[in-house]
Regions:
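S-adenosyl-L-methionine-dependent methyltransferase catalytic core, i.e., the SAM/SAH-binding region
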Residues: 1-187
Length: 191
């Protein structure tokens, strides 16, 4: 699986963590293990890196890339960090990294449905569990769509966009990432 990850602000992250060779560090969003590999390279056998990710693709790639180092990758969201680390017996820790947002792998992998550049099923799930974006836009109420767009997308035109999505899905369900009719209807509002 192709999973390219160029870590952003790598030197700043390493400086900020002030890595001790025998320290315990957590990457709460391990992804392609770009940051984690560089952290783990600086650890001795007395140190440890624990990587978290809810994306099974990322867990598989990171596990392979971190195999030569004192590192463990777990398939959990970082919001479960305290519980998981306590169960592993590795608290307290010396540093935590969270590189938040959608990864380039998720954007580049057509089947994930995040890309605006490729036609794909409308998925947009980080962990491949739960409701897909297709199910969401075709089933939730206009009010709930508006709340989601406003809360998570910080979208000031959330009500208008939700209204247009509901109108569009009444004509024909929305299935693909490149179905532009909803965007075209909403764009006139911004023009």
């Amino acid at each position: 699986m192709e999973f390219v990850h160029i870590p952003v602000l790598l030197h700043e992250v390493l400086d900020g963590l002030a890595i001790r060779p025998d320290g315990i560090y957590v990457d709460g969003t391990v992804g392609g293990a770009g940051h984690s590999t560089e952290i783990a390279k600086r650890l001795t056998d007395g140190g440890r890196l624990i990587g978290f990710d809810r994306d099974p693709d990322a867990v598989a790639v990171a596990t392979e890339r971190l195999a030569p180092y004192p590192a463990t990758v777990v398939h959990h969201n970082y919001d479960e960090m305290q519980t998981v680390l306590t169960e592993m017996g590795v608290v307290p820790v010396d540093g935590v990294l969270l590189d938040l947002g959608v990864s380039s792998h998720q954007l580049d992998e057509d089947s994930r449905g995040f890309s605006y550049h490729h036609d794909a099923p409308l998925d947009m799930r980080m962990s491949q569990t739960g409701m897909t974006a297709e199910e969401l836009v075709n089933t939730v109420s206009e009010q709930e769509l508006s709340r989601i767009l406003y809360t998570y997308g910080e979208e000031s035109f959330a009500r208008s966009i939700a209204r247009n999505i509901v109108r569009a899905r009444e004509e024909k369900p929305i299935h693909r990432s490149e179905e532009r009719r909803v965007g075209k209807e909403c764009r006139s509002r911004w023009s």
